Amino acid sequence: EDKIKEYLKKNGNDFAGALRLIPLKTRKLFVHSYQSFLFNKISDEFLKIHRGYNKIKNIKIPIIGFDFEAGYINDNKLKNIIKKTINEEKISPRDFIISQMPELTSEGNFRDLFFELKGLKILEISEDELNQDKKKAKINFTLPKSCYATTAIEFIFQ
C-alpha cells in the first residue's frame, strides 16, 4: 500500500502503473473474484426461480468475460437473469478487456451449476464457543477444479 501511495505521488494519476506494483497473481485474483461474484449472483437468482421444483437439470452458467454473448444461452429465464445482473452491476462483457493491462483481460467461460461433492465426511461435531447454544462441525470433502468450498458448505447447511 505504501509503495502504491509513493508511486502515485511521483507519477500523478498513473493508476495502471501503480497497480502493476501488485503481483500479477494477485491482480488476476481481483478479476477472477469479481467474475466469481457474478457467477454466484446469477446462480443464486436462477435457483430462486426454480425453488420448489423436484429436479433441476444441471446447466452451465457463464463466467462473464469479454467474449460472452447472451445468444449462447438457450434458457430464457437464465438469459434474463444474466441481462439483469449485467445491468445492475453497470458492466459490459467488453469491460473485461483491459487495454492498459492486457495480462488481466479475461474471456470468461462456462461452469456447471451443480457439481459432485466427493468423500463427504463429518469428522467432528462439538459445541461452538463463538455462538452460544450452537454446534460446529468439522467436515472433509473433495471438489472438482474451479468449484468453491464456501458454496458447497452453504448448500449443505441450508
Where are these regions (language model features)?
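Non-catalytic, substrate/partner-engaging modules appended to enzymatic cores
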Residues: 1-158
